[in-house]
């Protein structure tokens, strides 16, 4: 193949654009979606998830996160150029057309729908509100003062879907975990929004960081505290093994470190603190994994 041919260069350019639109080169969003889904799968299956179900949720999560990123850039196409962190995205650089982005979103959603084939009908039904939340979230930044709260619901729907896929029902522990994850999402995405706060104020985008104003850090820590409290409630409801409870002091320490970091409100530090939430995700997964092992 001639690597300098017009066709190859065109395909290479489109591939680069699509990867950047999908954030395939930035896996943190997929990880933050996967952790709560894995928590739910391991709890619902007593630590032995069916491999087909596990694969369906893993691939489906990646595809829907990618679709969400594409539609987010479509929704923010008139604003990203004015924000320091997003000024180099494909839409801001004029490298992608609106129709192209919408077709890519539809294609990714179609692929994600194929992941539902091995799952039961209840999971199929629950995928409909999940799809609606994922595709409408970016537009809430125009009118809803705390769009990160809405995002929390979108990012948490994998939890009841996982319980539905495993047991064909959604028990109370699924909804406790759902509520906990909404608060966790609100916490870490508010930190994410703090990195763009100055730019968002200038262009009129609504975010939780803007709405909370000077109380943004207090709101973040309140959400973190509520998240940890609900995880403790979940532990009590499921009669968690001792290993589950070891996560709480570790997570509290990680949350305190986040508090110490974001007090500066420095853009880069806020972004790095957002990324650090991946640690909280895997700590809780390790605790749930250990619980299912020792509870047998």
Swiss-Prot record:
Q: Which reaction does it catalyse?
A: all-trans-octaprenyl diphosphate + 4-hydroxybenzoate = 4-hydroxy-3-(all-trans-octaprenyl)benzoate + diphosphate
Cofactor(s) listed = Mg(2+)
Location in the cell: Cell inner membrane
Cellular component GO terms, alphabetically? plasma membrane
Q: Which GO terms describe its biological process?
A: ubiquinone biosynthetic process
Coarse class of the primary localization is membrane
Q: Which PANTHER family match?
A: 4-HYDROXYBENZOATE POLYPRENYLTRANSFERASE, MITOCHONDRIAL (PTHR11048:SF28), PRENYLTRANSFERASES (PTHR11048)
Query: Which protein family is it in?
Result: Belongs to the UbiA prenyltransferase family.
Protein name per UniProt: 4-hydroxybenzoate octaprenyltransferase
Q: Which gene encodes it?
A: ubiA
